[in-house]
């Protein structure tokens, strides 16, 4: 237990508190040496040797002061420096099967790093950490390549691995045909295109609309001198309530003759740090039921957006067996068949 606590202390120190407030020299050299020279557990000694090897890098890095400032202000330069330092440490911990240490360090980071809402930070970590671990373990990429891919720390053109070679069929291109506008009196179709509705079923009129989270208008009282969330919606950090989406679509159905509908996804709200599969399916089924009621006998050509998945943006390919996306595809298929596809 004491060795584990030492490992947690070292990881938290180098990845979290140091970035925020504390100088590395505040830890006694004797403390580090006593841990390193303990022969009880070679694995933990290897781990701590790696950690202490980063001490000099932290103290001597010419960009470290900029990192501390930029991290507080969520600048991409700070994220890149943090990624450059953290990626090899994370890989080492994964190799040693010490993911619990990363979890503990991230939890402390979320509690101490005041520039991020703690609930958003912890929720996002819970949603995405397992995926990050899997990508880091499976991706045949260097640390620099990972940081370039995640945060655009370097142009991806710097790395040949990101330059895909797409071979086209060895056939001549067809001769372009000039556009042929329809003749006067040709039949006309009216198409309704719905996209990015982002309905928030937790929307609360009068609540705080400029909160510390990416999505507001859900709870809390507005600050003195600030207006609360409007009944029909708000232009601040808020999605629309269900009744606004319903009224808008009813209005469209009443004043327009719609022949068919393009429906290109992104129904759920933007609370991506605490969404579950059940939340996403509730949003999808509820909005689809509303569409079927308001536009009966209309064919709806649908697509899926990045926000339908849980976690958001993640659509695992079929070769990922541990966390497949069939739970979403099956529900979408049922709904799309109902829409006439």
Positions of PLM-derived features:
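Classical eukaryotic N-terminal signal peptides for Sec-dependent ER targeting/secretion
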Residues: 1-13
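Non-catalytic terminal accessory segments
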Residues: 3-6, 18-189, 194, 206, ...
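Short, flexible/disordered secondary-structure transition segments
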Residues: 94-97, 117, 157-161, 204-205, ...
């Amino acid at each position: 237990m004491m060795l584990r606590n030492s490992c947690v202390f070292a990881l938290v120190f180098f990845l979290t508190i140091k970035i925020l407030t504390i100088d590395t020299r505040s830890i006694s050299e004797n403390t580090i040496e006593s841990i390193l020279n303990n022969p009880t557990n070679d694995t933990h000694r290897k781990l701590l040797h790696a950690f202490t090897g980063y001490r000099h890098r932290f103290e001597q890095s010419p960009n470290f002061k900029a990192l501390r400032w930029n991290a507080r202000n969520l600048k991409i330069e700070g994220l890149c420096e943090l990624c450059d330092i953290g990626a090899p440490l994370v890989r080492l911990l994964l190799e040693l099967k010490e993911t619990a240490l990363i979890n503990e360090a991230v939890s402390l980071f979320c509690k101490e790093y005041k520039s991020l809402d703690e609930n958003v930070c912890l929720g996002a970590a819970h949603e995405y950490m397992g995926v990050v671990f899997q990508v880091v373990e499976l991706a045949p990429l260097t640390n620099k390549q990972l940081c370039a891919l995640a945060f655009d720390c370097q142009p991806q053109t710097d790395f040949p691995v990101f330059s895909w070679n797409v071979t086209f069929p060895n056939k001549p291109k067809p001769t372009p045909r000039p556009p042929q506008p329809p003749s006067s009196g040709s039949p006309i179709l009216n198409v309704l295109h719905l996209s990015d509705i982002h309905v928030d079923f937790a929307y609360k009129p009068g609540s705080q609309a400029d909160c510390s989270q990416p999505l507001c208008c859900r709870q809390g009282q507005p600050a003195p001198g600030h207006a609360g969330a409007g009944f029909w919606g708000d232009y601040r950090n808020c999605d629309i309530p269900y009744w606004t989406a319903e009224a808008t679509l009813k209005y469209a159905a009443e004043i327009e003759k719609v022949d068919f509908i393009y429906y290109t996804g992104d129904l759920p709200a933007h609370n991506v740090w605490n969404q579950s599969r059940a939340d996403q399916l509730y949003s999808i089924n509820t909005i689809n039921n509303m569409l079927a009621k308001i536009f009966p006998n209309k064919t709806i050509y649908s697509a899926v957006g990045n926000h339908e998945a849980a976690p958001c943006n993640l659509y695992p390919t079929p070769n990922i067996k541990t966390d497949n996306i069939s739970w979403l595809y099956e529900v979408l298929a049922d709904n799309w068949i109902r829409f006439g596809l």
